[in-house]
């Protein structure tokens, strides 16, 4: 362990020079590290069911049911695009060996925020990531991708790593890049899914791939091929993420 910040420990592999993040809550002998007592035994590896060698991802296709989300001013509702991309992402991640849990798998379900929290609690002991898929809307002029990450990672940590990897992948598709957002509310993370996941020690973020109400951005989401491209970009970023963190 070479550093601990915001509850996350960065663990270096001296043989390769690379490192990974792990929740400091999973480490023993953290006090010895912090005190710099080199005479003590090294920190022992984490012992928890959460770290089991299986990439476990909860995918949340945002909105659903009566909550359609944003709209392009015509027939394209956000809840549809979110689900279609999520279904492809599930397929791609499972092909890579991940275990995937879907918050919803139909257009009719998923309008309640509490459903997200219930799924998180059900899989809290094994989930390595809560990944929420959304598409933005504003005033028809705004465009581009942004990621809503957990505030604990503002200065570095798992969701910031994944957020940057996502933006890098989206940029390859030609999507304008906006920013990584760390928004704080009165009770922690401003965004519900980030806040609820943080309470369960699950890294979580929301991908806002582009603006569904912007004419230029719509070209990135108006076909099945586009949904597959977005899902592949997300898969690439998530698989990279899992090379940087323990799971």
List PLM regions with ranges.
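Active-site-adjacent substrate-binding region
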Residues: 158-186
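Conserved beta-strand/loop element in small beta-rich adapter and peptidoglycan-binding domains
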Residues: 1-5
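Catalytic-core regions of hydrolytic enzymes
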Residues: 36-162
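Sec-exported extracytoplasmic/periplasmic mature domains
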Residues: 32, 87-99, 121-125, 135, ...
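Hydrophobic anchor at the start of a short beta-strand
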Residues: 100-101, 177-178, 204
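Active-site-adjacent mobile loop/cap segments within catalytic or ligand-binding domains
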Residues: 132, 136-139, 148, 181-247
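Boundary regions of SH3-family modules and the immediately adjacent low-complexity/disordered segments
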Residues: 13-47
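Short aromatic-glycine-enriched beta-strand elements
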Residues: 6-10
């Amino acid at each position: 362990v070479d550093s601990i910040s915001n509850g996350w420990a960065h663990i270096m592999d001296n043989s390769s020079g690379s490192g990974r993040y792990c929740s400091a809550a999973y480490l023993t002998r953290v006090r010895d590290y912090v005190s710099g007592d080199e005479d003590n035994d090294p920190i022992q590896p984490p012992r928890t069911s959460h770290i089991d060698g299986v990439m476990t991802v909860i995918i949340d296709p945002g909105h659903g049911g009566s909550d359609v989300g944003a709209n392009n001013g015509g027939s394209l509702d956000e809840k549809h695009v979110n689900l279609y991309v999520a279904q492809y992402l599930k397929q791609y991640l499972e092909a890579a060996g991940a275990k995937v849990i879907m918050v919803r798998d139909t257009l009719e379900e998923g309008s309640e925020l509490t459903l997200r929290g219930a799924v998180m609690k059900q899989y809290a002991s094994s989930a390595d990531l809560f990944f929420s898929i959304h598409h933005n809307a504003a005033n028809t002029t705004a465009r581009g991708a942004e990621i809503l990450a957990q505030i604990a990672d503002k200065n570095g940590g798992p969701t910031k790593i994944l957020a940057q990897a996502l933006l890098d992948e989206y940029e390859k598709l030609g999507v304008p890049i906006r920013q990584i957002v760390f928004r704080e509310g009165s009770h922690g993370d401003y965004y519900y899914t980030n806040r609820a996941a943080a309470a369960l020690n699950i890294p979580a973020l929301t991908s806002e791939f582009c603006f569904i109400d912007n004419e230029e951005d719509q070209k990135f989401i108006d076909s099945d091929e586009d949904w597959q491209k977005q899902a592949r970009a997300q898969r690439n970023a998530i698989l990279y993420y899992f090379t940087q963190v323990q799971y």
